[in-house]
Amino acid sequence: MIEPHTPAYTLEPTKRVVANDQPSHPRTPNFINDIAAGKVELPTIPRVVQQLITALRDPDVDTRKIGAALSQDPVLTAKVLRLANSAFFGGQRSMASIDAAVSLIGTQALGRLVLAGGVAGSFGTVPGIDLPTFWRDSLIAATAAQKLAPRVGAEVEEAYVSGLLHGTGHLILCKTYPDIADFVFTGYAVVRGAELATIEQENFGIDHPNVGALWIETIGFPQPVADTIRNAAQPLSGSAGPLELTLRSACALAAAVARKDEAAAAFARLPPVVQARYGGAGGAPDAAFEKLYEALQETEPTM
């Protein structure tokens, strides 16, 4: 069975929501009309973050230019320095220079850090959502997508962005309509994927994949990312492209990590075409997959 799209909406585990027996909120809004009427304020990514993301796409960018842009945002600067001084990058001496930190981390890793921090910061608090859990699961999906992309044939950065942002539509709905979110979700357990999208459609008049795709388009991320997220709760077709296969697989692995599945159980939830890229003897996962999954289990938040 293929694991569907999995935004990590985590509540107290009292009972599991089932769309067919969950009462609908008496007021169903029209999200698109509310945007047109100025009643919905979509999250905005800080200008400095947008500038950094654009600059970091240039493989020949001057690291001093990046350092100068970073210095405009003390929070991001602190995160970059903390990462540069972490055990992952050696951590043998205290590094206080942002230029040196940028050189050490590298532009690709820095771009992902800036994107993750900028996106998470743009949402602030969301009533009823366990944001640390949400962003940790999103980061695991993003990391999984990044690692899967080369074998599946997807563009690496598009895969990472898709994994990171795939559940943001749910945050937007809950932040925009907190009364409906409270009515529908309070007191219920984890709700994921197509099940969550069905409940959202019934109560909000739209689901998180469509909201997330709309937001991604407004902030100027690549169209393939928006299209892939828009289709993420639909049944996976035989003609699914590399980016869609990568996102579905990444979400399956993020859900497996949340359930504390063993590697073999996580592997069994991948689409067959992706399993074939990592298959060992007898249909079991190979050493590369086991190493990938172990790394996902050890993922620490950097937001």
Model-derived segments and their meaning:
Residues M1-R192, L196-R269:
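Conserved alpha-helical "signature site"
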Residues A252-M303:
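C-terminal appended segment following the main domain
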